[in-house]
């Protein structure tokens, strides 16, 4: 049954590696192919995983819910994801999922508006496109509107439009006045003449958007595998942050785009917000718990520290390994 699920739901982004030793591949599940996640691709491309004793293959899943499901089933040991409400609800109810690193500690969204809206005052009464209610784009839209001094429940109309392409089409057609846009689609929005009114990452929004998550069981049984993976990953992050030209080429491969400007937009944005030391985001998880508590007050008894394990990044940091990566550059 498990093998059938894997065969039907995943495809391998890289051909299975031929182990240099007898080590079996470590499968990392990706909830999506999107901006920020390319740091994992860079890590593999520069050989950092193999240098740290890890034979890593990437598997694409059909969203965050499936990634969490397969992680908890034991079919894969690590995922890029696990930061949203579903994951934290599962953890609170006794599931073994746990965040060991956060490498996008904010929501990578901006609010773009048409040319008639030059400032926050003119945003009042506007229609703003998101994917769906309760989504990260919804959360980001409400946060940005609030930071602009407006009440998202009264001063604007937030509309469920769909994915990024559908939201951009709605903005172009004039059926909405603004939209939540992620990088590198921010470049396309500007090229179409739309104005960036707010950037959530610059307004102080803390959120565990992209994470490395595993299970308590895997940490107990194979702590060296988790440590080796994260040691390689911080090496990949260091390369990404300090080698723009090479990283842009890898972004083009990963996102499957030919436009250098699109890849550069992604690089400029995510290299700015990707931390050198990807500690699990305690503040971000705390925000998710507060979001859940609105409808599930019982979760107020939980502490954010129960949902993360920062021991691996702490060890890498305190040993001087991470700082040493940047001294070499």
Residue locations for each model-derived region?
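Secondary-structure end/capping motifs
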Residues: 220-301
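Bacterial N-terminal signal peptides
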Residues: 4-16
């Amino acid at each position: 049954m498990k093998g059938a699920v894997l065969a039907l739901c995943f495809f391998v982004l890289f051909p299975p590696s031929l182990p240099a030793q007898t080590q079996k591949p470590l499968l990392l599940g990706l909830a999506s192919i999107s901006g920020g996640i390319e740091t994992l691709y860079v890590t593999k491309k520069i050989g950092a995983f193999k240098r740290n004793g890890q034979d890593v293959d990437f598997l694409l899943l059909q969203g965050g819910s499936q990634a969490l499901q397969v992680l908890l089933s034991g079919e894969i040991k690590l995922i890029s994801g696990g930061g949203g409400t579903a994951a934290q609800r599962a953890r609170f109810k006794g599931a073994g999922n746990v965040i060991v690193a956060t490498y996008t500690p904010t929501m990578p969204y901006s609010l773009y508006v048409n040319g008639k809206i030059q400032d926050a005052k003119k945003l009042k009464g506007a229609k703003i496109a998101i994917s769906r209610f309760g989504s990260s784009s919804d959360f980001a839209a409400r946060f940005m509107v609030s930071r602009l001094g407006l009440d998202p429940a009264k001063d604007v109309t937030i509309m469920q439009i769909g994915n990024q392409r559908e939201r951009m089409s709605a903005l172009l057609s004039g059926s909405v006045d603004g939209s939540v846009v992620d990088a590198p689609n921010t470049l396309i929005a500007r090229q179409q003449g739309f104005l960036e009114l707010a950037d959530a990452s610059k307004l102080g929004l803390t959120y565990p958007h992209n994470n490395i998550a595993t299970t308590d069981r895997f940490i107990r049984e194979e702590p060296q595998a988790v440590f080796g993976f994260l040691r390689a990953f911080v090496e990949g992050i260091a390369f990404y942050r300090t080698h723009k030209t090479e990283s842009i080429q890898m972004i083009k491969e990963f996102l499957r785009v030919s436009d250098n400007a699109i890849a550069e937009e992604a690089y400029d944005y995510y290299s700015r917000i990707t931390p050198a030391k990807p500690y699990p985001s305690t503040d971000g998880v705390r925000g998710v718990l507060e979001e859940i508590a609105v409808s599930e007050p019982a979760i107020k008894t939980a502490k954010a520290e129960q949902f993360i394990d920062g021991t691996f990044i702490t060890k890498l940091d305190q040993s001087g390994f991470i700082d040493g990566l940047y001294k070499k550059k």
